[in-house]
Curated annotation (Swiss-Prot):
NCBIfam families assigned: PRK05445.1
Name of this protein: UPF0304 protein PBPRA2768
InterPro entries named in the record: UPF0304_YfbU, YfbU_alpha-helical_sf, YfbU_helix-hairpin_sf
UniProt similarity note: Belongs to the UPF0304 family.
Gene3D superfamilies attached to this UniProt entry: Helix hairpin bin (1.10.287.680), yfbu gene product, domain 2 (1.10.3190.10)
Superkingdom, natural source: Bacteria
């Protein structure tokens, strides 16, 4: 993150104020204040790790992935017992994205589920939508297969299996 000295001074003052306003986080803000004041380049990257830009088409893709998982789950519920036995229910769970390499996507999913209240049926589990493995390519293949199905919200067990195996 490149900042002028004036910007660093302003940010340092903001961290100082935050340390005074929230005593429970004082150590965190003092640390950040020191990083900014002294200009430690490696640690300065921490400051902008949560700032990013997720373009509109990427947001729409994520919503499509989540909607596809919703359709998979609802279709599974409509299957008879014999058909349900052909699908492993845990595979229907929306896992999210890899926080290490797809952090913007993880944050967007959390925003949609926590702030916007969308997809309350999705289990956050202890990982909070951090799949711990890259998922973007897998979801894209699944989405393509799902879009080729004639009845996207009334899938058969074989269609569900095809989508999950994409």
């Amino acid at each position: 993150m490149d900042m002028t000295n004036a910007q660093r001074l302003i940010l340092s003052n903001q961290y100082y104020l935050m340390s005074q306003l929230t005593p429970e986080n004082e150590a965190k803000y003092r640390r950040l204040q020191t990083i900014v004041e002294r200009g430690y380049g490696l640690q300065m990257r921490e400051l902008d790790k949560d700032f990013g830009c997720l373009p509109e088409d990427a947001c729409r893709n994520i919503i499509d992935y989540m909607e596809m998982h919703h359709a998979l789950q609802e279709s599974y519920k409509m299957l008879d017992d014999a058909s349900q036995s052909q699908v492993e229910p845990r595979r229907l769970q929306f896992l999210g994205f890899d926080a290490a390499t797809e952090s913007q996507q993880v944050h967007y999913v959390r925003f949609l589920t926590e702030e916007e209240g969308l997809y309350p049926q999705f289990d956050k589990s202890e990982h909070q939508f951090n799949s711990q493995v890259q998922m973007q390519d897998k979801y894209q293949r699944m989405l393509q297969t799902w879009r080729n199905c004639p009845r996207q919200y009334h899938l058969s067990s074989s269609e569900i299996t095809q989508i999950l195996s994409a």
